[in-house]
Amino acid sequence: MAAQPQDREGGAQLAGPAAEADPLGRFTCPVCLEVYEKPVQVPCGHVFCSACLQECLKPKKPVCGVCRSTLAPGVRAVELERQIESTETSCHGCRKNFFLSKIRAHVATCSKYQNYIMEGVKATTKDASLQPRNVPNRYTFPCPYCPEKNFDQEGLVEHCKLVHSTDTKSVVCPICASMPWGDPNYRSANFIEHIQRRHQFSYDTFVDYDVDEEDMMNQVLQRSLLDQ
């Protein structure tokens, strides 16, 4: 079903080309880039998953990752939560429709969705083998904010934290873009929080590039917890 621009009480509003290109973007947390879970609206009007917000509030002087204003505990985004419960999207595997609140649990067990992901990964691998010059470099990365480059993953995280912590520009994550499932055109609205939450570990240590992203993330989370 088509998604309509939401008001300030529902969360960050998309309009124009951005809304048309990503009609479900208003249901996506700018930190974890997943459909909101227990969405909470903070005083500046932006919305985060409850768990993501708790992480963002940990620094001594927390700021909103979207607008960089002072961050404070928010209130439950009841209207947005209602819309997530009532808005449908389709599974790319079985093509059945599900409410946004149910789609994440569904794709975790849908064999057709797993096949869809594997076909995409295999196609990417096949194309890369035919065009070796286009194989992404997964060892060093450029900074998406400035001309600096040749960072390893940990170096890029540290550089962005030290140099670009107040930069509000939406940028493409070079680490995600290098993955077989990565979208080189997807711009994170909150790259600093994203890179700190999703890329504190080394993909080369944990990742089997022959599996899909869902399985990969589960493996990474399990192994990273064991290493703590």
Curated annotation (Swiss-Prot):
CDD domains: RING-HC_RNF114 (cd16540). Its main location: cytoplasm. It is found in: Cytoplasm; Nucleus. The modification N6-acetyllysine is found at K102, K112. Its EC number is 2.3.2.27. Autoubiquitinated. Polyubiquitinated in the presence of E2 enzymes UBE2D1, UBE2D2 and UBE2D3, but only monoubiquitinated in the presence of UBE2E1. The keyword Transferase applies. GO terms for biological process: cell differentiation; protein polyubiquitination; spermatogenesis; ubiquitin-dependent protein catabolic process. GO terms for molecular function: ubiquitin protein ligase activity; zinc ion binding. GO terms for cellular component: cytosol; nucleus; plasma membrane. Gene3D superfamilies: Classic Zinc Finger (3.30.160.60), Zinc/RING finger domain, C3HC4 (zinc finger) (3.30.40.10). Pathway: Protein modification; protein ubiquitination. Keywords: Acetylation, Cytoplasm, Developmental protein, Differentiation, Metal-binding, Nucleus, Spermatogenesis, Transferase, Ubl conjugation, Ubl conjugation pathway, Zinc, Zinc-finger. Zn(2+) binds at C91, C94, H106, C110. It is an enzyme of class 2 (transferase). A zinc finger (C2HC RNF-type) spans 91-110. A zinc finger (RING-type) spans 29-68. It catalyses: S-ubiquitinyl-[E2 ubiquitin-conjugating enzyme]-L-cysteine + [acceptor protein]-L-lysine = [E2 ubiquitin-conjugating enzyme]-L-cysteine + N(6)-ubiquitinyl-[acceptor protein]-L-lysine. E3 ubiquitin-protein ligase that promotes the ubiquitination of various substrates. In turn, participates in the regulation of many biological processes including cell cycle, apoptosis, osteoclastogenesis as well as innate or adaptive immunity. Acts as negative regulator of NF-kappa-B-dependent transcription by promoting the ubiquitination and stabilization of the NF-kappa-B inhibitor TNFAIP3. May promote the ubiquitination of TRAF6 as well. Also acts as a negative regulator of T-cell activation. Interacts with XAF1, the interaction increases XAF1 stability and proapoptotic effects, and may regulate IFN signaling. This is E3 ubiquitin-protein ligase RNF114. It comes from Sus scrofa. The lineage of its organism: Eukaryota, Metazoa, Chordata, Craniata, Vertebrata.
